[in-house]
Amino acid sequence: MKRTYQPKKRQRKKEHGFVKRMRTTSGRRILKRRRLKGRKRLTA
């Protein structure tokens, strides 16, 4: 059986990227929370 995590840069960006987060209201909320928390990296 293969492992569940098969990393792909494009897929990762498409699912968890900055642009995707900015598109939705909930995504913007996530970014806002991460900024407040002081995260060095906001998205993948």
Curated annotation (Swiss-Prot):
Organism encoding this protein:
Alkaliphilus metalliredigens (strain QYMF)
Q: What is this protein called?
A: Large ribosomal subunit protein bL34
- NCBIfam families from the xrefs? rpmH_bact
What is a single cellular component term in the Gene Ontology annotation?
Answer: ribonucleoprotein complex
Under the GO molecular function aspect, what terms does this record hold? structural constituent of ribosome
**UniProt biased composition (Basic residues):** 1-23, 29-44
Q: Where is this region: Disordered?
A: 1-44
Would I find Ribosomal protein among this entry's keywords? yes
User: What HAMAP family is this protein classified in?
Assistant: Ribosomal_bL34
Give an example GO biological process: translation
Keyword Ribonucleoprotein listed: yes
Corresponding gene? rpmH
